[in-house]
């Protein structure tokens, strides 16, 4: 009998699509957030939770160069939640929907026996520039990320440490204040609402893109799968929040590992044509170039400051992928 451990998540999805008559990768983004799996209501502000759910699906649209249009939300509400709490979640949803420019938003409520469940779907309009001339990817095209990586995972670690202290009656909240930028990256990730429009205005069209949801390693593997090329990521070019290494030493955790395999950064990863490098650097200074496409036989690797190439490993992928 085949197990998920044998084939990995990506191969499982590929096999399920085979013979179904449908293709993967439709321009509809979907996300399900489950209490106890994706969030802890003990410390997660409900308004931030609603906002984060919308950011998760909006980022998928941005990665495909779509302008957001329609948002659909279904809340599975458990008995422990009252109307004011549901209203807080909805306020976070509508705030994010306005920020990101959605034209239509729908909401449905369903009962849940197993805690809060948030199901969000989004669709949008494709950028007109991609209809005319989406460039083909080439070796040396740039891997560009929209913000700091590993911050959300480290922020979650801070919240879990504070929860343990709170349960022991030792909470002083000093660490929350000290690492508030990391905590904020976890509780309320944000994307530039105008990123697709800015790319259109600059006439820079990425040849591929994805949203970083399960670490940079997973995202780079997805890019390699999309383009058919290998990819190199340089450890000394990964952008980090200011005190990531300070916290990493305290937790005995390598921030590079958090960036490569941590989750929920919700930053964009675009493949930008090498010929557009100077223009991209000038017009998109909040992005960092972390690597480039390579020959397919290279695979996907992390290059250390010493020049050693380490194969990327990511949850949901087989070891040889």
Residues of each region from the PLM?
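Phosphate/diphosphate-binding glycine-rich loops and adjacent basic-rich segments that engage nucleotide
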Residues: 128-188
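Glycine-/charge-enriched secondary-structure boundary and capping motifs
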Residues: 1-11, 77-103, 110-118, 123, ...
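Glycine/charged-rich beta-loop-alpha catalytic/anionic-binding loops adjacent to active sites
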Residues: 35-43, 126, 177-182, 252
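Small-aliphatic-rich amphipathic alpha-helix that forms the alpha element of a beta-alpha
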Residues: 46-70, 91-99, 198, 210, ...
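Short, surface-exposed beta-edge/turn micro-motifs
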Residues: 25, 141, 265-268
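Short beta-strand-loop/turn "lid" adjacent to the catalytic site in phosphate-handling enzymes
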Residues: 66-82
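Polyanion-binding loop/helix "lid" in catalytic or ligand-binding cores
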Residues: 173-222
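Extreme N-terminal cap/leader segments of soluble proteins
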Residues: 1-45, 73, 92-95, 321
């Amino acid at each position: 009998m085949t197990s998920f451990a044998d084939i990995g998540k990506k191969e499982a999805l590929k096999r399920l699509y085979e013979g179904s008559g449908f293709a993967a990768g439709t321009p509809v983004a979907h996300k399900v957030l489950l209490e106890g799996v994706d969030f802890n209501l003990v410390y997660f502000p409900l308004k931030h939770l609603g906002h984060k759910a919308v950011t998760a699906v909006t980022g998928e649209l941005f990665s495909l160069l779509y302008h957001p249009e329609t948002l659909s939300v279904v809340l599975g509400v458990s008995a422990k939640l009252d109307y004011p709490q549901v209203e807080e979640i909805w306020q976070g949803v509508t705030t994010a929907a306005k920020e990101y420019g959605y034209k239509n938003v729908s909401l449905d409520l369903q009962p849940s026996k197993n805690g809060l469940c948030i199901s969000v779907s989004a669709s949008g309009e494709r950028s007109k520039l991609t209809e005319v001339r989406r460039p083909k990817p080439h070796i040396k095209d740039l891997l560009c990320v929209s913000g700091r990586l590993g911050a959300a995972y480290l922020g979650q670690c801070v919240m879990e440490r504070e929860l343990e202290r709170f349960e022991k009656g030792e909470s002083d909240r000093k660490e929350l204040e000290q690492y508030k930028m990391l905590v904020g990256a976890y509780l309320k990730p944000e994307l530039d609402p105008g990123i697709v429009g800015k790319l259109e205005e600059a006439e820079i069209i990425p040849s591929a893109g994805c949203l970083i949801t399960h670490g940079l390693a997973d995202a780079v593997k997805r890019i390699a799968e999309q383009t058919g090329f290998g990819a190199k990521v340089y450890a000394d070019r990964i952008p980090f929040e200011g005190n990531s290494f300070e916290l990493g030493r305290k937790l005995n955790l390598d921030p590079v590992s958090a960036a490569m395999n941590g989750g929920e950064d919700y930053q964009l990863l675009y493949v930008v044509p090498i010929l557009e490098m100077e223009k991209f650097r000038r017009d998109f200074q909040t992005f960092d170039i972390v690597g480039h496409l390579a020959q397919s036989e290279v695979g996907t690797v992390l290059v250390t400051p010493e020049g050693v190439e380490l194969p990327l490993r990511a949850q949901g992928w087989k070891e040889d992928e």
